[in-house]
Amino acid sequence: MTTSNNVNGCFGDTKLTKVFVGGLAWDTHKEAMYDHFIKYGDILEAVIISDKLTRRSKGYGFVTFKDAKAATRACEDSTPIINGRRANCNLASLGGRLRKSPTMTSPQQGPKNGNRATPPHVGNHSQWYYPSGFTNQQHQQQNHQAVPFYGYPSAYVAPNMTFNQKVGYVGGTYMNGYYAQMQPQPQSQPQPQYYHHHMYGGGRVMVGAASPMVPFYTVYPYHQSQAIGFPQPSFSKPLSFSTPPISGTVGGESIQKKAIH
């Protein structure tokens, strides 16, 4: 048995006699490979290629037979089991077939529209945030109808509510026990709608609209009825003053004046 490390060898033309053996275990020695292929014919050389620095097997080697018929018989079983592991072999002149790791399947992608993937649907919907003690079912039972600020008529403008043209927000103001404050927003963005919510107890509710800037409403406890509106103006007549009748005697003469209303 020849076990030279000279892969090129000096055996003349080995185009039909040299067999490539790949997929070997790392601990496979050339003696184990020789013992497997000796049954096909005389072997001139059997080598396992190893790393020059670590001297560790690279997992493949070569077997050179004495005649081409032996090499052909050895390649009939292209996936032999050597040293307890399935290997692969073929003529070295055809090129080595190193065993590759199984191809990883690419993750499934969502439905595509032509060559472009369909983006997820993003709707212009409002997102609600509830304070503690306020459930989603309570939110669904309420009638979310867009109304002006807490029942005030649209024509009403609070005297202490100012609008800053440069910043673009409505200043904070107290309205019938409520305190409303808007965060600054660019003028080009539409103002969010306001919804009628009656909530008891302290807390903060965030009403989101299709705008990155979200208004904040701080709700204070109140004990008024839900129907909130303007107090009806009441007018009263001026108070009238009356003087009692005056009677008496002046200089012996009796005088009497009537009451003035």
From Swiss-Prot:
Tissue specificity: Expressed in vasculature of leaves, roots and siliques.
Biased composition (Polar residues): 102-116
Single GO MF annotation: mRNA binding
GO biological process per UniProt: regulation of seed germination; response to abscisic acid; response to salt stress; response to water deprivation
Location within or outside the cell: Nucleus
Keyword field: Nucleus, RNA-binding, Stress response
Residue segments, region Disordered: 96-122
GO cellular component terms given for this protein: nucleus
Null mutant phenotype: No visible phenotype under normal growth conditions, but mutant seeds have decreased germination rate in presence of abscisic acid (ABA) or salt, compared to wild-type.
Induction of synthesis: Down-regulated by abscisic acid (ABA).
Segments forming domain RRM: 17-94
Pfam family, one: RRM_1
Gene3D superfamilies: 3.30.70.330
Transmembrane helix listed as a keyword: no
Protein role: Probable RNA-binding protein involved in the regulation of abscisic acid (ABA) response during seed germination. May regulate transcript levels of several germination-responsive genes under ABA.
Name of the protein: Probable RNA-binding protein ARP1
Organism name: Arabidopsis thaliana
